[in-house]
Amino acid sequence: MRYFLIILFLITHLGAQSTIISGFISDSSSGEALIGANVILQETGQGMATDMNGYYVIQDIVPGDYVLMVSYVGFSLRKEKLTISEGKSIKLNIALLEEVVELSQVEVTAEQLQRKANIQPSKINLSPRMMKAAPALAEPDLFRTIQALPGVLTTSEFSTGLVIRGGNTDQNLILLDGVTVYNPSHLGGIFSNFIVDGVKEAELIKGAYNAEYGGRLSAVLNIISREGNQKKFEGKANLSLLSAQATLEGPFYKGAWILSGRRTYFDQIFKKNPNIPPYYFYDIQSHVYSDITPKDRLSLSFYNGIDDLLFGTFGLAGRWGNSTLSTQYRRVFSEKLIGNFLYANSLFFTEFGLGGSNGLNSDNQIDDATVAANFSWFKSSESTVKFGAQLKNLGFLYTNTFGDSLQFKIETQPKEFASYIKLK
């Protein structure tokens, strides 16, 4: 631990020696961070795209006068005049205004071709707008959108299972705000768990994924929740053929919150028909954050999705679902070093019974507690070093009873540790 702190101190100290422009890019209407915004110095072409936190760093700048250009699709171009002094760093947070994109004359200009060093193959970023525009069954669905992408197949027309480049559906790593979701589907795989109005972005990596991801063979789907509107309170609701949905959001102490929920209503429509089992499912997805200081952010994410089936005629009862809870702390140690710390818990369970309390009952449970630390060190304008570690405490429980008699019980509690370092 002592050596680790020494390394952090050295990185922080080294990061303070060069001329740097750094900061966060956000949406002016809501305060949400903009991922992938382009930040470039007009005179030199130096710049980068913002990371998952909306953070950017431009280094090794020669003293002089510059124009900083910030652009993002759907937002107006922002230009800032800057004067750079030797050895002096500038922290500049910029909020972009939304703009209607007009199709007009396109003028393409270019200077000397530069080497593209940050290309990642097989990576696709999906926005809520793309999810809502894609064909879907009953209502917009993230997994249905992904199934329309190249290299992605499905097991059947009625399944949201993702078969990516020949892998099985259980070989994909599904993450929601850094937390593993073990069974992200409802109604036997017909609908996915995630509420589109509560999703900020979904990143699909179909192969050659980065060192920080592990534990699966096929692909990675990293889902990021919306952060909420920091400027004002607002809400919306809609009704589809499948469910009723609502989303509320608003400002919180130096931050924002958002709450999304949905529930199907088939059980209410057919409750007078004894031949149709009263089945329903619901999802609740929320996120809240607070910028405690300009360098520190604390956030909390929660998800709960349950399927419930009760068919009294045959004594059949079933209940299964997922629940995740995560706490994240982000710290900007210096212009060049940013760290993210995570504590998370993920639970997946199934409960099935046939014949009531005197019949056959089966319970299955996966409990995942995770602690992780990830760092990004912007070493230079040409390279970024990412490193981190993760510890998982897993619990697997499977029991089967017949009446009051325990048929069998299987319980294991393995642990996993992983660390990584990569140069980008």
Each predicted region: which residue ranges?
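Short acidic/polar hinge/loop motifs at secondary-structure boundaries
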Residues: 57-60, 133, 179-206, 274-279
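Short, acidic, small-residue-rich periplasmic hinge/interaction motif at the N-terminus
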Residues: 26-30, 37-42, 71-75, 85-135, ...
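N-terminal periplasmic accessory domains that precede
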Residues: 90-94, 142-145, 160-162, 189-195, ...
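Hydrophobic, lipid-facing positions within transmembrane beta-strands of outer-membrane proteins
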Residues: 160, 217-219, 233-235, 242-246, ...
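Extracytoplasmic beta-strand/coil segments of soluble accessory domains associated
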Residues: 134-137, 143-183, 200
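Periplasmic-side early beta-strands and strand-to-turn transitions of outer-membrane beta-barrels
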Residues: 229-231, 251-322, 350-351
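Short, acidic Ser/Thr/Gly-rich low-complexity loop/linker segments typical of extracellular
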Residues: 44-55
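Face-selective signature of the C-terminal outer-membrane beta-barrel domain
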Residues: 289-306, 319-424
